[in-house]
Regions:
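Peptidoglycan glycan-strand catalytic modules in the bacterial/periplasmic cell-wall system
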Residues: 1-163
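Low-complexity, Gly/Ser/Thr/Pro-rich intrinsically disordered linker/tail segments
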Residues: 151-195
C-alpha cells in the first residue's frame, strides 16, 4: 500500500524534507498550460500538516502556516510515522477515513491482504475521494481509470514492489511488460488521475 501511495501521491517522499521542488515545478507548468489550477504540489507531509492542524481555506497566510507545520513534522517525526498518520487520517470516500476502513469498505479485507492492483486503486482515489465509489470498484471503473491504475502498477514494479503476475492481473499489455523487464527505467511522477 505504501508503495502505491508514494507512486500516486509523492514519489520523492522518502528523499525530500517535506517539500518537492519537482512537484512545484510540474504543478506550475500544468496549471499554466491549463489556465487554471488542475494540480497541486502538496507532499504527503504537507497534507498531514493541512489535515491535522489547518482549515481548508486557501490563503497565503494558511499556506505559510502549512509550511512551518510541515517543517516541524519533518524535524520531529520519522517518515514512517508521517506515512502512518497520513494513511489513517485522509478521506478515502464519503465518510471513510483511514486505510483500514477503506480496505474493508472497497475490498472486504484488511490492508495487509490487498493485492497490488487494489492498493493502486486506493492510492488513485486519494485525489478524488468524493467521487462516490462503491464496494468492489475494480469491476466498475472506466477504461481511462484502468490505464491510470496500470501506470501506477508499472511504476510500483519499477520500484520493486510488484511482480509480473500483478501487471498481468491488471491487464498491462505484454509489450509494456517486456519493456519494463528489459529496462526498469527511471521513476517519473504519475500524472493526475482522469476526470
Amino acid at each position: 500500500m505504501i508503495s502505491a501511495v508514494i507512486t500516486a501521491e509523492d514519489g520523492g517522499f522518502f528523499s525530500h524534507k517535506g517539500f518537492s521542488q519537482r512537484a512545484i515545478k510540474d504543478a506550475f507548468a500544468e496549471n499554466l498550460e491549463a489556465g487554471r489550477i488542475v494540480r497541486g504540489a502538496s507532499t504527503i507531509s504537507m497534507q498531514v500538516a493541512k489535515n491535522l492542524f489547518l482549515t481548508r481555506e486557501r490563503t497565503f497566510s494558511r499556506k505559510f502556516e502549512e509550511t512551518f507545520i510541515t517543517m516541524a513534522l519533518e524535524q520531529n517525526l520519522s517518515k514512517e510515522r508521517i506515512m502512518e498518520i497520513y494513511l489513517n487520517i485522509i478521506e478515502w470516500g464519503d465518510g471513510i477515513y483511514g486505510i483500514g476502513p477503506a480496505a474493508s469498505f472497497y475490498f472486504n479485507k484488511p490492508p495487509r491482504n490487498l493485492k497490488p492492483v487494489e492498493s493502486a486503486f486506493l492510492a488513485s482515489i486519494i485525489a478524488r475521494p468524493g467521487k462516490n465509489w462503491k464496494p468492489d470498484p475494480l469491476t466498475k471503473i472506466s477504461e481511462g481509470w484502468w490505464k491510470y491504475l496500470q501506470l501506477i502498477l508499472c511504476k510500483i514494479y519499477e520500484r520493486g514492489d510488484a511482480d509480473i503476475a500483478d501487471l498481468r492481473e491488471a491487464g498491462v499489455p505484454e509489450e509494456r511488460i517486456r519493456e519494463l523487464v528489459e529496462d526498469k527505467g527511471q521513476y517519473e511522477s504519475v500524472p493526475s488521475p482522469p476526470e
